[in-house]
């Protein structure tokens, strides 16, 4: 299931990571469409797959850990997610990563916040994408009220791949990109669903050695 990272996309990721770590910007977004094959696999994940797969390891480890819990019709989604794990590993220099693929139906993480990691990859496969706001020096997530001015809120389109610097990033000065999961509770029931991939360092919160992988059907 694993394949070598696309050289072009790997170069884009390495350049993006270099820009973040050189202080040119705390965030980069790689735009891409979702193929028909991938969209069908996402639908299969929603219908038949687990609500959560949380694991850590190398991409090869993740393939072995996650494959038994995915329906065969959703394998193209897992293959894409593992491909992004490889790209993140190459760009970040980490050997192992934390991998979280989940179906979200609540207002989880709806408040604007920053992450206590160096670098995080986010990709929304289905539903509303992650929202973020620009900040000026000295502003914190707690001091912002972007809901008062919706024009301040930006949304990452589904399928696009985002790299966000966290609080531990070398140029973050203790504060990474301010972002949130978009609230879902105000939407019709049929629209209250996101499929989100999060990849970051293996020591990130929520990862326990004794439960690798953690799977919720």
What are these regions (language model features)?
Residues 67-110, 114:
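Extracellular-facing segments of soluble proteins and assemblies that are Gly/Ser/Thr-biased and enriched
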Residues 106-160:
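Catalytic core of non-heme Fe(II) oxygenases with the double-stranded beta-helix
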Residues 16, 108-112, 184:
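Catalytic micro-motifs at enzyme active sites that drive phosphoryl/nucleotidyl and oxygen chemistry
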Residues 30-33, 127, 165-167, 200:
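Structured loops at beta-to-helix junctions and adjacent beta-edge loops in soluble globular domains
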Residues 149-217:
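Catalytic core of Fe(II)/2-oxoglutarate
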Residues 81, 101, 125-131, 135, ...:
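Active-site environment of non-heme Fe oxygenases that use a 2-His-1-carboxylate facial triad
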Residues 44-47, 138-140, 211-217:
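Short intrinsically disordered coil segments
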Residues 1-79, 83:
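N-terminal auxiliary "cap/dimerization" subdomain that precedes the catalytic jelly-roll/cupin core
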